[in-house]
Amino acid sequence: MADLSFSDGDPTVRTLLRRVLETADSRTPMRRRSTRINAQRRRSQTPYSNRQGSQTKTSARKQSHGARSVGRSTRVQGRGRLEEQTPRTLLRNILLTAPESSTVMPDPVVKPAQVPEVARSSRRESSRGSLELHLPELEPPSTLAPGLTAPGKRKQKLRLSVFQQEVDQGLPLSQEPRRSRSADVSSLASSFNLTFVLPGQPETVERPGLARRRPIRQLVNAGALLQDLEDNSLASALPGDSHRTPVAALPMDVGLEDTQPFSQSLAAFSLSGKHSLPSPSRPGVEDVERVMGPPSSGTRLQSRMSRSGPAASPSPFLEPQPPPAEPREAVGSNEAAEPKDQEGSSGYEETSARPASGELSSSTHDSLPAEQPPPSPGVAVLSSEPLESVTAKCPSRTQTAGPRRRQDPHKAGLSPYVKFFSFCTKMPVEKTALEIVEKCLDKYFQHLCNDLEVFASHAGRKIVKPEDLLLLMRRQGLVTDQVSQHVLVERYLPLEYRQQLIPCAFSGNSVFPAQ
């Protein structure tokens, strides 16, 4: 028989009554009064009374069997009169007389997948993310409970394993063939559905927090840098200069051929500057020779520069400047002063004057690298020869400062005691007074060290002990028979050190520290 549900058609009176007749039991669900009385009697009877009851039952069954056969014939005859008074016959009469159309909606209108009103009223929807349970309305006790089958049919069990698998897979419940179910099962039981709605994950707003952005590192384009250098050199170049060559135009093998360090080139230049003195006839030629070094290196650099082409743009780093006048004047004055010193002074003064001039020239050239700015990456490819010319053509500064005074390490060790003396006076002390204190401390420590050295060598000791210092203090007159070492400690040491050095009895015969 086809499965009847609310979705098949309109809920008319006829369909409702038909469902009630199909689901209603032919027998009354109430137990007879005689069966309840018999159950109560069974509980109250003893084993002896049970035996008597069994004998009477057998006789009563025989009598009742004959009476039943007679009663059946009478029931068939009186069924016509009793059917008019039962609710079942009344419902059948209503079905025969009631119209097929609905009383609410006279014209039958088919609505696809319409939700029944009874199920809507009974549906209890919970909050989002929880279990939604749709239950039908409770029927009067005359109908069967949902999930129970009609009498005489086997109860169909629900397998939880299949149910859990389908819920995990997110598939609808399997619709097994309902051939085993009879037409007596109510449509309300078939509409019993369990729908599980999984809680949706809340939308979280991702915040970056303290995550720092990676630094954007831009690569340096060497070609663009060299192009900018060429543009700057073209803008700052003079129209008549043809001896200037740009840094980018020089061949790369120049930097690879001569790779001597920068410090050696400066040292060689400073040594050559000591012995080469300019003559008044050729001041510019000797300056160029002194700057460029030996002729072999100069010619090699000129050949490299001539290969690069005469029409190349000049570079601001290699612009020739006029030779400085101050070093020549200073050297010339030294030349004039040397004959005068030779006439009126001894040979010792001559030798002392020449190293002084050498020191002056070397100090001027040593100070030049510190004054120059760091070279750009494009210039680092060049050899050390152009750098020599750049450093030589910068104007030099004459340094008149004399040699630095070296501080005596012995006096440097006495400075803490001098500071301690100025602290103990609790008043400002002049510098001359502090110098006298330093001299006194120097003399005292010298005598003390000499005495310790003599005593240690005489006694053959390698370690100075407190007894040696006490003996020296006696010889110096600081410790005598009237003034002992403990008296000096009491006078010049604070209390916390005094308690550790001087033995004292604090409880009976126990002395601290132990002697």
Curated annotation (Swiss-Prot):
Function, as annotated: Component of the CENPA-NAC (nucleosome-associated) complex, a complex that plays a central role in assembly of kinetochore proteins, mitotic progression and chromosome segregation. The CENPA-NAC complex recruits the CENPA-CAD (nucleosome distal) complex and may be involved in incorporation of newly synthesized CENPA into centromeres. Part of a nucleosome-associated complex that binds specifically to histone H3-containing nucleosomes at the centromere, as opposed to nucleosomes containing CENPA.
Keyword ATP-binding: no
Assigned GO CC terms: chromosome, centromeric region; inner kinetochore; nuclear body; nucleus
Places the protein is found: Nucleus; Chromosome, Centromere; Chromosome, Centromere, Kinetochore
Predominant localisation class: nucleus
CDD domains listed in its UniProt record: HFD_CENP-T (cd22920)
Free-text domain note: The largest part of the sequence forms an elongated and flexible stalk structure that is connected to a C-terminal globular domain with a histone-type fold.
Region annotation (Disordered) ranges: 24-156, 271-411
Signal sequence, start to end: none
Keyword Metal-binding part of the UniProt annotation: no
Alphabetized SUPFAM superfamilies for the sequence: Histone-fold
Protein name: Centromere protein T
Flexible stalk domain: region residues: 94-375
Keyword entries, A-Z: Cell cycle, Cell division, Centromere, Chromosome, DNA-binding, Kinetochore, Mitosis, Nucleus, Phosphoprotein
Residue numbers of Phosphothreonine PTMs: 86
Positions with biased composition (Polar residues): 45-58, 296-306
Pfam families, per the entry: CENP-T_C, CENP-T_N
Gene Ontology biological process terms, A to Z: cell division; chromosome organization; chromosome segregation; kinetochore assembly; mitotic cell cycle
Single GO MF annotation: DNA binding
Self-association state and partner proteins as the record states: Component of the CENPA-CAD complex, composed of CENPI, CENPK, CENPL, CENPO, CENPP, CENPQ, CENPR and CENPS. The CENPA-CAD complex is probably recruited on centromeres by the CENPA-NAC complex, at least composed of CENPA, CENPC, CENPH, CENPM, CENPN, CENPT and CENPU. Identified in a centromeric complex containing histones H2A, H2B, H3 and H4, and at least CENPA, CENPB, CENPC, CENPT, CENPN, HJURP, SUPT16H, SSRP1 and RSF1. Interacts (via N-terminus) with the NDC80 complex.
Family: Belongs to the CENP-T/CNN1 family.
Native organism: Mus musculus
Family annotation (InterPro entries): CENP-T, CENP-T/H4_C, CENP-T_N, Histone-fold
UniProt PTM comment: Dynamically phosphorylated during the cell cycle. Phosphorylated during G2 phase, metaphase and anaphase, but not during telophase or G1 phase.
PANTHER family: CENTROMERE PROTEIN T (PTHR46904:SF1)
